[in-house]
Amino acid sequence: MEFDADYIIIGAGSAGCVVTDRLSEKGHSVLLLEAGPKDIHPMVHIPAGVLHLLSNPKVNWNYSSEPEESSGNRRIHWPRGRVLGGSSSINGMLYVRGNPADYDGWAQMGCKGWSFENVLPYFRKSENYKNGGDPEHRGTGGPLEVEDYRTVLDLTHAFVEAGHQAGYPKSQDLNGSMPEGVGYSQMTRRGRLRGSTARTFLSRAKKRKNVKIKTEAIVTGLIFENKKC
C-alpha cells in the first residue's frame, strides 16, 4: 500500500480514532496504523460481551502491573485494547469525564490550554447526550452517543441512597456541573450496540479519501530525516 500522508498515527485506540477524524475533516491526509485486527469480533459490539474480552488475546494486550508492596507483591491484570477502537472496544462502556480540579491543576503547573474551562468545549463538541442536562456542560450533535442507563437495578438505587445518607451530596449528573458526590453512571452506546470511538469517530473518518487504515500493523521504529518522519 502506497499512501503519501501528512500525518501517521500509531494506534487506533480511543485517542487515535478521534485524532484521525479531526485531522482528516480539516483536509489533512492521515495514515492510521493499528497493531490489532478490525473490530469485527461479535463480542466487541454486544454490551454484555465485555466478559469475553477482558482476557481475549485476539483483541487485548493483557498487560500486567509490576509487583508492588501495597498490592501484596502481586501482578494485577491490566486489560488494554488491541483492536480498532482500542480500549473503548473492550471496556465497560462507562462515560466519566475527568474531575475539573485535575485539569485546573495541570494548567496551574504550566500546561497552558488544559484548564477545565479550556477543555470543556471539546467535551461538549464530542458528545451527543440524550438526557438533557445543563447546556453549559453537556453537548448534543457530536459523534459520541452518551446516555443514562435505561434500566437501573433496585440495588443501584439503594447504593446511591446509602451514599447520600452517609453524607455525600447527590449529583443529578456526574458529568455536569456537579461531578463530586454520588449519582448514576452514564454509558456510550450507539443504538443497542457498543459506541466505541471506532464506531463513532472512525466510522465517519474512514469514508474520506484522505484516510487510510492499516490493521495488524506493528510499528517497531521511526526513521527521521531533517526532523520529519
Model-derived segments and spans:
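N-terminal glycine-rich phosphate/pyrophosphate-binding loop and immediately adjacent elements
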Residues: 1-124
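Conserved redox-cofactor binding core of oxidoreductases
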Residues: 107-226
